[in-house]
């Protein structure tokens, strides 16, 4: 009953701060641009190590995720880590769920090195961007791999980049 009045009041009060309304789709794009993880990245299979957050797990005191972080399988050097991806040909669309295969290799399970978890068109950058996981991602920045979508019979060459597409230092965020 009071929703419209509240909305109008918030817009009115926010005018001096250049506040504008935006929807959840815009929020989703902004979180990908900023490299923030959400449901597609934290799906029950990911650990702090996958997300590049292992230094936040206390080695001295008990903490959530501490026991899991000590398991041998999660401490391998080839673990898939959160990375950013952008198409080499900027006009190409990316597809969430695409598998990541090194250039020149066949798209087989043995050659699968990761996947694109979240994709959006970035109006700020003017092209598609993606978050995803790829083996040793943090050491492969600048490398080009293939994003393969077998359901649509589509292969797109992508570059591995930082998952922080916009304002990586947080200057805009902090003002």
Stretches with model-predicted labels:
Residues 1-175:
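Conserved, structured C-terminal
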């Amino acid at each position: 009953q009071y929703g419209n009045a509240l909305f109008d009041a918030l817009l009115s009060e926010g005018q001096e701060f250049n506040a504008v309304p935006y929807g959840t789709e815009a929020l989703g794009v902004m979180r990908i641009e900023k490299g923030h993880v959400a449901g597609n990245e934290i799906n029950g299979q990911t650990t702090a190590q996958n997300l590049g957050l292992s230094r936040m797990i206390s080695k001295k005191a008990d903490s959530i995720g501490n026991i899991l972080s000590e398991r041998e399988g999660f401490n391998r050097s080839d673990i898939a880590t959160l990375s950013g991806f952008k198409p080499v040909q900027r006009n190409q669309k990316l597809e969430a769920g695409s598998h990541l295969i090194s250039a020149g290799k066949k798209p087989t399970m043995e050659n699968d090195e990761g996947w694109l978890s979240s994709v959006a068109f970035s109006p700020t950058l003017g092209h598609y961007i993606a978050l995803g996981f790829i083996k040793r991602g943090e050491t492969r920045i600048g490398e080009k791999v293939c994003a393969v979508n077998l359901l649509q019979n589509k292969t797109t060459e992508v570059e591995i980049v930082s998952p922080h597409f916009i304002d990586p230092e947080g200057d805009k965020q902090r003002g």
